[in-house]
């Protein structure tokens, strides 16, 4: 197939304003393409040379392209640079340059689609020393045999500026028209695309085998499935009304979505929410997840969070991103170790599970997942009709450092690529920050792990209630200490240690060690949230709930303060209410803006 036939259709597509017309042109293009190269045509039409999840970038800069154009046409680069602004588009420039040269030569070879495609693949894959020169030579090679119109599109494709406005969905429409008897199988085609988003391969299969070909498309290890997404509602009550009384309420971890493919021999590939291959920066995840599903082939849907290695607490999302940026992987693995929570199973040992109910998928997932310290099953609760229970679980989830809940319909199938109502998220809506530190009393401690073995990993902190003359817990604090402070801590607190909870402390939490409430520390958190466990503010803001400080950090000891000078319960309640007002204002503001 000659590239000029494709270029002519691109020219028509470029000129059209009607979507149906565009689909028609594409349909004709696809029908006139030999099936065995239809994948190549589809990738090129989308301005690419592979499925987008492969992340292969042509990425040829304009400067480099002008060098190639100059080499191919004999027109000096300065001259091209002069002409470029007048034409305003790299494609038009290439067309102009090649037409000037074409006037003087007659012996050019016809360019085939295969040759253009293979050359572009080589351009994309050229790396290392001499890669730039090689790219220039490769591009110049096809440009010297190109007709002006061909040069226009080659220029735009290599510089990633094709902009025909053809998207995956348009290609699916055209494929339906061309090979699947119009619209009858359009939905099925899209479902297949959602589980196998390599649109070139799909095109080839339906061109070669028609409707029967559709059935051959299945979940395949190494090809990412488009993830199912969640809707959002504002309250537990609304959610229960929407889904029905029986639900799965799952922690909504604030980390990175990971679709993890594991082969029988332990090989692993990890895909992000946007289907990028993120296997490389997560050697730890590869290891512990493959161990947890040893002997099986699986596709797991998971969320991976960074944790504080010393306390096991979940850290905010940003900390995980160090993996991709600031730190080297090795160092990030130590400073920000991860835990992966699996919440769905899409494929097991050759069997596609998408059409099974969540109830059943979960059962199978539980059976095959041999949990270890780092590869865990999502924390969830099955709730039947009790809105209050759902609210409480939400508060618990927030207190544990998550964003809230994803509530799911146990009877639902896995809808790849769809934001449906069988998954609904309930997020904490506070956006305000806690800007003022508080002074809290140490009433207990928990032994540390890892680097903190032998000292405390976290302290149990309480606010003071002058009316009742008691201390009520408001957070577990495990961050913000220097190594020296940590090392000194057992000794520093030794004098206050007792073997039971002090009678003036009101707590629902069992600590490893208890103290007489004396030592005061300054603490800064991210915000104050409702809590099903902490006793500060209990029943005073909401029935059966207290208040907790989220992500508390140690700012220093307040040796100038005694326990009665600590921040009071009433002050914490006030801060919580203030914060709510700020949120309401911000929410109205953003609603007005929307
Ligand atoms: N138990 C869970 N089930 C499903 N998704 C979860 C779960 N825990 C955490 N998540 C994360 O929450 C997201 C679900 O929300 P949604 O589908 O709306 O994604 P989003 O558009 O990225 O939104 P958000 O910004 O709220 O994460 C998932 O993409 C996933 O990364």
Swiss-Prot record:
GO MF entries: ATP binding; DNA binding; DNA ligase (ATP) activity; metal ion binding
TM stretches of this protein: none
InterPro entries: ATP-dep_DNA_ligase (IPR050191), DNA_ligae_ATP-dep_bac/arc (IPR022865), DNA_ligase_ATP-dep (IPR000977), DNA_ligase_ATP-dep_C (IPR012309), DNA_ligase_ATP-dep_cent (IPR012310), DNA_ligase_ATP-dep_CS (IPR016059), DNA_ligase_ATP-dep_N (IPR012308), DNA_ligase_N_sf (IPR036599)
Residue positions of the active site: 252
Cofactor: Mg(2+)
Catalysed reaction, written as an equation: ATP + (deoxyribonucleotide)n-3'-hydroxyl + 5'-phospho-(deoxyribonucleotide)m = (deoxyribonucleotide)n+m + AMP + diphosphate
EC number: 6.5.1.1
Intrachain S-S bonds: none
Keywords assigned: ATP-binding, Cell cycle, Cell division, DNA damage, DNA recombination, DNA repair, DNA replication, Ligase, Magnesium, Metal-binding, Nucleotide-binding
Chain residues that bind ATP: 250, 257, 273, 303, 343, 419, 425
Biological process according to GO: cell division; DNA biosynthetic process; DNA recombination; DNA repair; lagging strand elongation
Family from the record: Belongs to the ATP-dependent DNA ligase family.
Role: DNA ligase that seals nicks in double-stranded DNA during DNA replication, DNA recombination and DNA repair.
Protein known as: DNA ligase 2
